[in-house]
């Protein structure tokens, strides 16, 4: 029989057969609020859709819906997070710094952690050659380092897209963790050609775009899903 291709990044491990897991402070559960701050090219490249595109360019409706998030939605959410004293992990396209840097500044001033999220969500990382991808990662790192005064350590790929070399390139670029893989409830060390990088879970079930736009979940049900996920993870 044909041998199936494997990724070779980590071995199989049943969560029921592992030793007890605890964070350095002794806590059993860690929570992060991941807020994606994304910028898209106008009338070219990829983009999330509120409604199916007509195929005619420019697709003003869907572009404007995405831009609403940077102009209005991000500010409404910042006010909510601050009212709840809730820290945020801000997953930032590097092109945001050229478009609306004041949004990043406001979140940074509120105590948000800045996580690299590629250059733009108008392109998929996995479509690049290895040299193109390495150059993109390096460019994003330089842009965030210049803006934040420190090199980013975490990464989420645009569209959660990877090439076969992405973990290797991220490790070589100085990243210590990334969020692309949703294969576990616990952080998992993944092999690269130069060492290890930590995979931090990024659960798709409580991601608003798949839940609300794809599966047509109501806002109330989505909120219940987040609460139920937290309660179940805490119980486990």
Question: Which residues does each predicted region cover?
Answer:
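Catalytic alpha-helical scaffold of carbohydrate-active enzymes acting on polysaccharides/glycoconjugates
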Residues: 2-198, 222-236
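Positively charged, amphipathic and often flexible ligand-engagement surfaces
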Residues: 185-187, 199-221
